[in-house]
Amino acid sequence: MNKLYIGNLSDHAGPADLESVFKDAKIPVAGPFLVKTGYAFVDCPDEGWALKAIEALSGKMELHGKPMEVEHSVPKRQRIRKLQIRNIPPHLQWEVLDSLLVQYGVVESCEQVNTDSETAVVNVTYSSKDQARQALDKLNGFQLENFTLKVAYIPDETAAQQNPSPQLRGRRGPGQRGSSRQASPGSVSKQKPCDLPLRLLVPTQFVGAIIGKEGATIRNITKQTQSKIDVHRKENTGAAEKSITILSTPEGTSAACKSILEIMHKEAQDIKFTEEIPLKILAHNNFVGRLIGKEGRNLKKIEQDTDTKITISPLQELTLYNPERTITVKGSVETCAKAEEEIMKKIRESYENDIASMNLQAHLIPGLNLNALGLFPPTSGMPPPTSGPPSTLTPPYPQFEQSETETVHLFIPALSVGAIIGKQGQHIKQLSRFAGASIKIAPAEAPDAKVRMVIITGPPEAQFKAQGRIYGKIKEENFVSPKEEVKLEAHIRVPSFAAGRVIGKGGKTVNELQSLSSAEVVVPRDQTPDENDQVVVKITGHFYACQVAQRKIQEILTQVKQHQQQKALQSGPPQSRRK
């Protein structure tokens, strides 16, 4: 994305004028200006300079009395689903941005772009062309906390490949016909084994040695290891460390990583750099808990097997746009390389499990797009849930469009209440808007109560979003051990006459439900129904477990209601005959 479109130009504007403007702004170009009537094109050295030109010149610089418009040059065939949103308030809460974006469609990914500006920039991918167009129309020029958002298309090469022209469609071989529609759920990770890149942090002073003269060294590594390697040297100007992204097979990735380590150690000897040079791997926070393992067992085993010392940056260092943790490995080049293989093996396993889980949950909890809820890392290339014939893949659970508002009582640690509410109630208000649910925290039952009840009222999708964010907040704020999963207790009320259906004959239904969801489900015996003739069902478990259990119980209740309605209809005709 280093090609720029320069619009709103005067008819008198020429290449020399544009060269002068870019020179004054200290923005280099990689070729001549191609000037047409009223607009022009130019190439920048890289994406970073292109973005800097957009931020410095678009709407801010006049040429012959007309303000220039500068944006990425995107061919019409690639103006599909991807947008770049600039000038985002720097301290904006994720919930606010998320709730704004989802108003216009399903957001498949939202990634921050590193810039030198104070405001934030994100690249957003919507699930359809129409949704992206609507978001562009509505958000470009939108005022958000006294900042004016600027939105433009960026190239969507993936969509262009997935939607070939009619001429190309007819040339596919017989084996390719319909392959994208007929892919089995288990084939996703096998088709794309390289979707998860290795991300490294290296000291800035070694970047030159890694790249080599005119890029010779990095080209050589790329060729030998069959890898794609991006050194993000233009990002975070002045930072002590730069990130490197390596995309290849697991073997190619590890080989490239080892080569980079060897180059850094050799360069350190040449410049008499005395400090230890550890291997630093960036990993999305979603994977870190499973890498550590229960009581740190997985990490300890990797340390013992590879003779290295491994530490992981604390949760407190995570920010809105940086969900990555830094895994620091200390040892020799050989031992660090072995540790990288083991660490990435574990992370890839977690990634593949998340894909499988996402496909499973998408069918267990129909109507939800899990990509849109920010549950998986946007940089991981997470594919959408596989589709197929409803009769073979989708269980006959009630669709959300037909569901009524539900009330769930979620019990959270009393100490976490302040974090859930936020300063002056800001967090809980934003969460309520984002989820589309009513969220209230009930008074403590006693002064020394260890848990507090959160009352969440809304349709199933709102419940999913609200409960998911509450689970996440409790984890982020360290109200449970970093090595543990968050497990909360949720209460839902069911009509007393339906409690037996939830339990099943001899407890069969509730046992199957616990096996399916991995949640603990209890219908306390000898309950006295409340004034609405309802009793409580208690569900305890991690987030997904609780969600699956809640949905299954709601399905049972729907079946009970439908059965009652059918009985009422069947009893109607005899009554009319007696009249």
From Swiss-Prot:
It holds the Pfam family RRM_1. It is found in: Nucleus; Cytoplasm; Cytoplasm, P-body; Cytoplasm, Stress granule. One of its GO terms (biological process) is mRNA transport. Signal peptide: none annotated. GO terms for cellular component: cytoplasmic stress granule; cytosol; nucleus; P-body. Residues 158-192 are annotated as: Disordered. The keyword Phosphoprotein applies. The modification Phosphoserine is found at residues 165, 184. Keywords: Cytoplasm, Isopeptide bond, mRNA transport, Nucleus, Phosphoprotein, Repeat, RNA-binding, Translation regulation, Transport, Ubl conjugation. Expressed in oocytes, spermatogonia and spermatocytes (at protein level). PROSITE patterns: KH_TYPE_1, RRM. Its main location: nucleus. GO terms for molecular function: mRNA 3'-UTR binding; mRNA 5'-UTR binding; N6-methyladenosine-containing RNA reader activity. Residues 2-75, 81-156 form the RRM domain. Residues 195-260, 276-343, 405-470, 487-553 form the KH domain. CDD domains: KH-I_IGF2BP3_rpt1 (cd22492), KH-I_IGF2BP3_rpt3 (cd22498), RRM2_IGF2BP3 (cd12630). The modification Phosphothreonine is found at residue 528. There is a cross-link at residues 450, 475 (Glycyl lysine isopeptide (Lys-Gly) (interchain with G-Cter in SUMO2)). All KH domains contribute binding to target mRNA. Domains KH3 and KH4 are the major RNA-binding modules, although KH1 and KH2 also contribute. The KH domains are also required for RNA-dependent homo- and heterooligomerization. The integrity of KH domains seems not to be required for localization to stress granules. Belongs to the RRM IMP/VICKZ family. Can form homooligomers and heterooligomers with IGF2BP1 and IGF2BP3 in an RNA-dependent manner. Interacts with IGF2BP1. Interacts with ELAVL1, DHX9, HNRNPU, MATR3 and PABPC1. RNA-binding factor that may recruit target transcripts to cytoplasmic protein-RNA complexes (mRNPs). This transcript 'caging' into mRNPs allows mRNA transport and transient storage. It also modulates the rate and location at which target transcripts encounter the translational apparatus and shields them from endonuclease attacks or microRNA-mediated degradation. Preferentially binds to N6-methyladenosine (m6A)-containing mRNAs and increases their stability. Binds to the 3'-UTR of CD44 mRNA and stabilizes it, hence promotes cell adhesion and invadopodia formation. This is Insulin-like growth factor 2 mRNA-binding protein 3.
